Amino acid sequence: MQFWQALPMMHPDEMLELAPVAEEAGFEGIMLADHIFAPETFDSRYPYSEGGEPPFDGTTPFPEVFATIAALSQITTRLRFLINVYILPLRHPITIAKGLSTAAIFSKNRTVLGFGAGWLEEEFDCLSIPFA
């Protein structure tokens, strides 16, 4: 059985502290969340909670996931890194390929990517990308 540690919505300093501890404890990997940003207020309904309220707000840090993997991979030796989920429609395919390949190089191929369509309409609006 494999166990993964979720680190979404954590401050980057806490991620750096927790990654080596998770590795020492025998976890298989770390899961990271992806958002370009979290707006201060939004009307979008969070689909993964009963009341539609997300577990984050506009003050929550969302460091760029490929850079985060590169950093965490330098202080661990075997942990895998899962982006759960990468919001595909918000980026150009070449940018995705570049970021993913860079993370794979720095992590020695310990990067796993889960794609998703996204749920936060305000994030799309900010980038002038149609939400459909």
Name what the model sees in each region.
Residues L16, H35, D43, V85, ...:
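A generic "cationic amphipathic patch" detector
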Residues E23-E24, A70-R78, L100, A104-T111:
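Acidic (Asp/Glu)-rich catalytic clusters
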Residues Q2-D13, L88-A132:
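Flexible, glycine-rich active-site loops centered on histidine and acidic residues
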Residues F56-T60, Y86-R91:
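Glycine-rich "substrate-gating" loop/helix at the edge of Rossmann-like oxidoreductase active sites
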Residues M1-I75:
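N-terminal beta1-alpha1-beta2 module of alpha/beta enzyme domains
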Residues T77-R80, V85:
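Secondary-structure boundary/capping motif
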Residues M31-L32, L82, G114:
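Conserved beta-strand positions in the central sheet of alpha/beta enzyme cores
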Residues G51-P55, L82, L127-P130:
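A short, mixed-charge helix-start or loop-turn motif at secondary-structure junctions
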